[in-house]
Amino acid sequence: RQRQMCIRDRDDAMDVYLAAMHYRPEWRSLRRDPWEEATYYPTWNSYGAFTTPLASLSTNHDPLIGITFGYRGNPHSWWSNRIAAGMRSAGYQATTITSIMDNYFELSELHVLPSYQGHGLGTRLLDSILQDCQEHHVLLSTPEVPGENNAAWRLYRHMGFNDLLRNFTFPGDSRPFGILIRTGL
């Protein structure tokens, strides 16, 4: 089952994130504050996938197995500034950069525990959050993999995301990322 998440789900969501991204436990302290800060954005939206069907929920602990969250992008945020700089370096026109960065939803996170991947949870989570979007564009970053050969890339392509930037790096993470865009929601 899935439902919108709230701040009390944060620790379980962080566990899903660390497992899905194969990050070391010390990443928890690096990401905790930015995640909490994001929950205060007026446009913050999130969904979680849980193991227990609602009808049989008889416990206080319902294991979280998938998460997604995002918010209306702020053209002055750290992430937006990095993406805009990458777009300039890639030769995008200033008017194109402005039109995208002034009206986008930042799909900040979409993760499913590895043992639950391949069952459509990511698709359902992504579909739920996209249905709520009011912005003209959705932007996301995902680690590059050879030949786009993983479930995340297949999901994003299936859901209509196209390349904005490829082999893009962020400070603090040496891995290359694809920056993807979906337009015309």
Where are these regions (language model features)?
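Conserved active-site alpha-helix within GNAT-family acetyltransferase domains
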Residues: 123-124, 134, 145-168, 172-173
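Conserved acetyl-CoA pyrophosphate-binding loop and the N-cap/start of the following alpha-helix
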Residues: 116-128
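Helix-loop element at the rim of GNAT/NAT acetyltransferase active sites that forms part
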Residues: 1, 14-30
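Conserved acyl-donor/pantetheine-binding loop and adjacent beta-alpha core of acyl/acetyltransferases
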Residues: 60-61, 69-109
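Short, small-residue-biased leader/transition segments that mark boundaries at the very start
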Residues: 2-7
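Active-site rim helix/loop that mediates acceptor-substrate recognition in acyltransferases
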Residues: 25-57, 69-72, 95-96
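Glycine-rich acetyl-CoA-binding "A-motif" of GNAT/NAT acetyltransferases
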Residues: 61-66, 151
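Conserved GNAT acetyl-CoA-binding A-motif
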Residues: 104-105, 133-145
